Curated annotation (Swiss-Prot):
Catalytic reactions of this protein: 2-formamido-N(1)-(5-O-phospho-beta-D-ribosyl)acetamidine + ATP = 5-amino-1-(5-phospho-beta-D-ribosyl)imidazole + ADP + phosphate + H(+)
Single GO biological process annotation from the record: 'de novo' IMP biosynthetic process
Coiled-coil positions: none
Domain of life of the organism encoding this protein: Bacteria
The protein, known as: Phosphoribosylformylglycinamidine cyclo-ligase
EC numbers on record: 6.3.3.1
Record gene name: purM
Amino acid sequence: MSEKNAYAKSGVDVEAGYEVVERIKKHVARTERAGVMGALGGFGGMFDLSKTGVREPVLVSGTDGVGTKLMLAIKYQQHDTIGQDCVAMCVNDIIAAGAEPLYFLDYVATGKNEPAKLEQVVAGVAEGCVQAGAALIGGETAEMPGMYGEDDYDLAGFAVGVAEKSQIIDGSKVKEGDILLGLASSGIHSNGYSLVRRVFADYTGNEVLPELEGKQLKDVLLEPTRIYVKAVLPLIKEELVNGIAHITGGGFIENVPRMFADDLAAEIDEDKVPVLPIFNAIEKYGDIKHEEMFEIFNMGVGLMLAVSPENVNRVKELLDEPVYEIGRIIKKADDSVVIK
């Protein structure tokens, strides 16, 4: 028995792994940007930081996955956008620190290497990288029979960006009186899906619920996470933003306080939050307390900015999209987030 056959009998298909690499090359090529060194397939991805033109560079890194949203992608056999979710979760975190994404690496683990399916996953990663302006410079595809079922896979990503040292956003500039501006989310994004799956456990995904404006449930649930990089970078370059909060797991309650000091609080006007229909559906069909929704989901605001009042108009001008004035920064009395 050859070594190859022995490995195949243990459940690992080396040839399928080679096929995946060949299939994804064209998708990786879409993400090329200045600074990338070397070709796909090396032991390590290389990037020339001098190509960024940043005078005092500070590297900012982030890693994340997409949680159990993956289980819906597997259930509905829609694998082409879940990679964008993975990129978004990472790059939106580092843009919140004032960093421009430079490069990205992905990690896919599966029970059985299916080249066509994994190509779809990586194509989604590449699309996310294009939207973020980041190069996909490396990754790993691990076939792990016995660890995962044949149809199962997990996905994680790693983003590295650069910030000008003087433009780092760390919460120190947020002050009482700052205006809170909300940027719209595209949907649920990539958190809260353990609850979402419970709420819709008995649904096929093909339903068109009255709350969802004619869309099938599965399409709304798998709507890819918005990537905010290209919208927000110009604001950072002009130093118009004092704080940024990426609204992920924990919703408003956990994420908004991460962008300011402990002696401050956020006062949110609920009537000004552009709540998306899917959140009304989740609340209704899941019989969830209204206030708890803000502790779990983004509620229609995926990124929140703290901006000095005199800069609000310029920020709106640069964003060129609907911007929601949903609150302000106040002195903390009790809670870090007050929803009125």
